[in-house]
Design a protein with these regions (language model features):
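Conserved alpha-helix/loop element of class I SAM-dependent methyltransferases that forms part
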Residues: 42-58, 75
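A short glycine-rich, Lys/Arg-flanked "PGG" loop and its adjoining helix->strand segment in the class I
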Residues: 151-163
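Class I SAM-dependent methyltransferase SAM/SAH-binding core
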Residues: 71, 75-124
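A C-terminal cap/extension of S-adenosyl-L-methionine-dependent methyltransferases
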Residues: 168, 212-272
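A conserved beta-strand element that flanks and buttresses the S-adenosyl-L-methionine
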Residues: 137
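Short, glycine-/aromatic-enriched active-site segment of Class I SAM-dependent methyltransferases
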Residues: 169-188
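Short alpha-helix
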Residues: 189-204
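N-terminal, positively charged/glycine-rich alpha-helical extensions of SAM-dependent methyltransferases
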Residues: 1-32
Length: 272
């Protein structure tokens, strides 16, 4: 293996780190859209947070693992104002400072529809004691931890759920056995679908659904649509591709192609 190829297996030097964790932030899609930038990774983050917000029922206690700059909060204020509580965990003081700034702006717009707490902690270490949560978000963050620490964090997330509670977990989909080259070198370890399912089940959860949230190349989308739904779905996709901006179509079409999608959203449940 050449030195250049070997580099692809390691987190890029200069990536913001705290110990073994990458604290590189996910795209701030709100800021990007405000200046006219619409790219699939930003729209992916918007979509996955909107999926969660629209599914939060009244009175739900919500935990955001590795909450970063608090990107889930605007959609929760807008679409789920009747949740009972939000708690955000993150290892980075800088990330939490951004989240608090965002919350201040949201409170000016929406008031205080639900209490919000931010807690600085290492999510792979023992967590503070909380009452059980009905919803746990763990979006686009697992890949920022080494594998074994990620397994521990998933066990803690599973233990934090009330019976019947739901974990929304998203992470890039890696293919083949480890060691694997990183798709994004701000990450530490990228998981295969099988590794995620194994760790989630070991945490006492069942996987109810898996959807793509970031697409492969269009020819791979076409191939999986044909396998799943037949030639009519391919014609439909191509018809949309001729009309719909790619960033929007990529985000939506990825939901239907989880076998080839480059990022997945797992919907996992603690049995009642």
């Amino acid at each position: 293996m050449s030195a250049e190829q070997d580099e692809q297996y390691r987190t890029r030097p200069g990536t913001p780190m705290i110990g073994p964790y990458s604290t590189n932030q996910m795209d701030d899609f709100y800021s990007a859209l405000a200046v006219g930038e619409a790219k699939p990774s930003g729209l992916m983050n918007l979509m996955q947070h909107l999926i969660v917000a629209e599914r939060c029922v009244e009175g739900a206690n919500v935990l955001d693992v590795c909450c970063g700059r608090g990107l889930a909060l605007p959609l929760l204020h807008r679409y789920a104002p009747k949740i009972a509580r939000y708690v955000g965990l993150d290892i980075s003081p800088a990330n939490l400072a951004e989240a608090r700034t965002r919350l201040t702006l949201l409170r000016e717009e929406y008031g205080s529809p639900f209490p919000v707490d931010f807690v600085q902690c290492d999510v792979s270490a023992p967590w503070p004691q909380f009452p059980p949560f009905d919803v746990v978000l763990y979006t686009s963050a697992l890949e920022h931890l080494p594998y074994e620490l990620g397994v521990r964090s998933l066990a803690a997330a599973g233990a934090a759920l009330a019976p019947g509670g739901v974990l929304y977990l998203s992470t890039p989909q890696a293919f083949g056995p480890p060691p694997r080259p990183l798709q994004y070198r701000v990450h530490v370890y990228e998981w295969s679908r099988e590794e995620v399912v194994r760790a989630v089940e070991a945490a006492g959860l069942v996987v109810d659904d898996v959807m793509g949230v970031l697409p492969p190349e269009p020819d791979e989308v076409v191939a999986e649509l044909a396998e799943r739904y037949g030639a009519g779905a391919v014609d439909w996709y191509r018809d949309l591709a001729a009309r719909v901006p790619r960033a929007l179509l990529d985000t939506v079409s990825s939901v239907a192609v989880p076998d080839r999608a480059t990022e997945l959203l797992f919907v996992c449940r603690r049995p009642a």
